[in-house]
Amino acid sequence: MSKVTVDLQMAFDGTGVPSKTLFEAWAEAAWQGENPTEVTIRIVDNDESRELNHQYRGKDKPTNVLSFPFEAPAGITVPLAGDLVICAPVVEQEAREQNKDAVAHWAHMVVHGMLHLQGYDHIEVNEAEVMEALEIRLLAQLGFANPYEAEETEPDS
């Protein structure tokens, strides 16, 4: 049985989005919890990403991945990690600009977002170092190169 159930929502009509099987593998690899969980991964366009980024982060531009951890009411235990909102056009554009394989960049965004759902952050330097080291290790286990080598922009969620 899988540790992570992925609810994949497609709100993007374009091409280049990886398969649900890949999203499941990446989310599973990044899940550090002992118990099974569920995550919603919503693939969106620039408009929806910009709107959510503006509403929740005060930034009026689309972004690669937004993470929304599930916060259960007191006394209620539900196996939900939360939601990831990934902007397909931004991920594809970043991959081109950074000369990265698009699938590798998609995997990085899922791993990055899943770690955010588990409380990891990159605001403080020491937290960023811990999170990035874990991302590098998890992506290597999935067969991908270090995403931070020669990177021009960082994940912005």
UniProtKB/Swiss-Prot annotation:
Top-rank taxon, per record: Bacteria
EC number: 3.1.-.-
InterPro entries cross-referenced by the UniProt entry: MetalPrtase_cat_dom_sf_prd, YbeY, YbeY_CS
Signal peptide positions (record): none
SUPFAM superfamilies: Metalloproteases ('zincins'), catalytic domain (SSF55486)
Known cofactor(s): Zn(2+)
Record-level GO BP terms: rRNA processing
Note accompanying the cofactor annotation: Binds 1 zinc ion.
Primary residence: cytoplasm
TM spans (from-to): none
Gene Ontology CC terms: cytoplasm
GO molecular function, one term: RNA endonuclease activity
Pfam families according to UniProt: YbeY
Family from the record: Belongs to the endoribonuclease YbeY family.
Known role: Single strand-specific metallo-endoribonuclease involved in late-stage 70S ribosome quality control and in maturation of the 3' terminus of the 16S rRNA.
NCBIfam families: rRNA maturation RNase YbeY
Protein's recorded name: Endoribonuclease YbeY
Top-level taxonomy: Bacteria, Pseudomonadati, Pseudomonadota, Gammaproteobacteria, Pseudomonadales
Gene from which the chain derives: ybeY
